[in-house]
Amino acid sequence: MRSLQMLLLAALLLGTFLQHARAARATNVGRECCLDYFKGAIPIRKLVSWYKTSVECSRDAIVFLTVQGKLICADPKDKHVKKAIRLVKNPRP
């Protein structure tokens, strides 16, 4: 019974660690990296600003901020993303 408790505790700690690692902050950058790209239509009218992910991130991405405060990770090579970048007037530094 004691070994089962230890196994469950280890699984819980591992799960907590993996969940934290999923946030994927780049080292010494302070910004998050994108793990996947948004696959839907980008709501251009709801976009407020955008920024590029750090060069330290493993995946190049554009991050759009919506009026609701949501972040959308997008592929910078996608033609719809390029159009959205042109239309959004306030890129963040």
UniProtKB/Swiss-Prot annotation:
What tissues harbor this protein?
Answer: Expressed in primary and secondary lymphoid organs, where it is specifically produced by a subset of dendritic cells. Not expressed in the spleen. Constitutively expressed in thymus, as well as in the lung, skin and intestine. Not expressed in bone marrow-derived macrophages and activated B cells, nor in thymocytes. In the brain, predominantly expressed in a subset of hippocampal CA1 neurons.
> For this UniProt entry, which residues form the secretion signal?
1-23
PROSITE patterns reported in the protein's UniProt record: SMALL_CYTOKINES_CC
Q: Which gene encodes it?
A: Ccl17
Q: What does this protein do?
A: Chemokine, which displays chemotactic activity for T lymphocytes, preferentially Th2 cells, but not monocytes or granulocytes. Therefore plays an important role in a wide range of inflammatory and immunological processes. Acts by binding to CCR4 at T-cell surface. Mediates GM-CSF/CSF2-driven pain and inflammation. In the brain, required to maintain the typical, highly branched morphology of hippocampal microglia under homeostatic conditions.
Q: What is this protein called?
A: C-C motif chemokine 17
UniProt similarity note: Belongs to the intercrine beta (chemokine CC) family.
Per UniProt, subcellular location reads as: Secreted
Q: List the disulfide bonds in this chain.
A: C33-C57, C34-C73
Q: Which UniProt keywords apply?
A: Chemotaxis, Cytokine, Disulfide bond, Inflammatory response, Secreted, Signal
Q: What induces it?
A: In macrophages, up-regulated by IL4 and by GM-CSF/CSF2 in an IRF4-dependent manner (at protein level). Up-regulated in response to various Toll-like receptors ligands, including lipopolysaccharide (LPS), CpG-oligodeoxynucleotide (CpG), PAM3Cys, poly(I:C) in dendritic cells. Up-regulated by TNF in dendritic cells. In hippocampal neurons, up-regulated by LPS, possibly via a TNF-dependent pathway, but not by CpG nor by poly(I:C).
UniProt-listed Gene3D superfamilies: 2.40.50.40
Q: What happens when the gene is disrupted?
A: Knockout mice mount diminished T cell-dependent contact hypersensitivity responses and display a deficiency in rejection of allogeneic organ transplants. In hippocampus, the absolute cell numbers of microglia is significantly reduced compared to wild-type mice. Under homeostatic conditions, microglia possess a smaller cell volume, reduced cell surface area, number of branches and junctions, as well as total tree length compared to those of control mice. This specific morphology of microglia partially resembles that observed in lipopolysaccharide (LPS)-stimulated wild-type animals.
Checking InterPro entries in the record gives: Chemokine_b/g/d, Chemokine_CC_CS, Chemokine_IL8-like_dom, Interleukin_8-like_sf
Q: Provide the GO MF annotations for this entry.
A: chemokine activity; cytokine activity
Q: Which domain of life is it from?
A: Eukaryota
Principal localization reads secreted
**A GO cellular-component term linked to this record:** extracellular space
